[in-house]
Amino acid sequence: MLIKFLKHTGAAQDGQPGDPDARLAIDYLQGEMVLKPERAGSPKVWIKRATAPIPISGHAWLISQTCAALPFQHRYASGVIAFDRHDIDIAAWTGGDVALRGLTDALMRDFEDTAFAGIPEEHRPEVLWNAHTDKRRLELNFLFARAVLDSQGRLKAINP
């Protein structure tokens, strides 16, 4: 298992415009078609994923609106928890295997508890979780606004 935070934060980078409402990142997480290079160094083209993304939890519209309302340059964090092909049986997981789903649900909960350590649940940002299985392994993708509510109800930037 590998946990990776991605460089995408909503800020403009490498000559590319920003994604202040996280819409591009959300579209990547949820889309059946993705913009990727066919080969290393080649221009990006629209490619259909081998399998459609699987929504797990979170409300994309709420996260997008939250990110759009933030006054920060880096408005969201995104990443992936990727498993080796031999760690999780994709067919069983996508079929709803109770034990495997329980395992990944607990892992996502533990990840959130670690990422937001010390922050009460009611002050944490909503997390969008989607699964990708198009690489013949399970990938749990996450995205959340980089802000929490303080005890006075004000938004404060966080850096997970």
Describe each model-derived feature in a short phrase.
Residues 1-160:
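N-terminal nicking endonuclease/strand-transfer module with a His-rich metal-binding environment
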